[in-house]
Regions:
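Short beta-strand segments
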Residues: 49, 79-83, 105
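Generic structural signal for well-ordered beta-strand positions
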Residues: 34-35, 137
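Thiol/disulfide oxidoreductase modules built on the thioredoxin-like
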Residues: 100, 107-155
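Short, small/polar residue-rich loop motifs at catalytic or cofactor-binding pockets
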Residues: 20, 44, 122-124
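Conserved redox-active cysteine motifs that mediate thiol-disulfide chemistry
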Residues: 44, 50-67
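Oxidative protein folding and maturation machinery
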Residues: 1-34
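Structural microenvironment flanking redox-active thiols in thiol-disulfide oxidoreductases
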Residues: 60-98, 110-117, 148
């Protein structure tokens, strides 16, 4: 009975501002295993973007995410996408259609994926912005909020 409550509390702690990276492993589109720590805490700000091909709001937000990526990718900003898809081909097709060029990971388990468990993600789109040393500095930045935060951090 307490397990779901504990999972929620732990997930919320894992994405609290100041929390260190809570690591997990998922595969890329070619089936190669990666840890989130392969991308986060490597000396640049990293946005972890939780999304899915079937999520209309996720797809609607993607042009903004792309614009931020293009503006700041050479200034110390990276993105890693975590897909909540269950269909590999739908995931691949969506990244092509949306022009997503940053790394993508998924275990193709939908809402039962490891990322949803570790960070207690219950709705998408959802984001976590990590500092260069791998600590959470913001969550759920969308629209102008993402661009404003990146400008604050990287337009120096």
């Amino acid at each position: 009975m307490l397990a779901p409550i504990y999972a929620e509390i732990q997930g919320e702690k894992n994405k609290a501002v100041g929390a260190p990276l809570a690591d997990f492993e998922m595969n890329d589109m070619d089936g190669k295993a990666h840890r989130l720590s392969d991308f986060v805490g490597k000396g640049q700000y990293t946005l972890v973007d939780f999304w899915a091909s079937w999520c209309g709001p996720c797809r609607a937000e993607m042009p903004n995410v792309k614009a931020c990526y293009e503006k700041y990718k050479d200034k110390g900003f990276s993105i890693v996408g975590i897909s909540f898809d269950q269909d590999l081909q739908a995931w691949k097709d969506a990244t092509t259609q949306l022009g997503i060029t940053w790394p993508q990971l998924s275990d193709l388990k939908g809402w039962q994926c490891k990322a949803a468990e570790v960070y207690y993600i219950r709705s998408i789109p959802s984001t976590i912005l990590f500092s260069p040393d791998g600590k959470v500095i913001a969550t759920n930045l969308r629209g102008d909020e993402l661009g404003d935060k990146l400008a604050e951090l990287l337009d120096k």
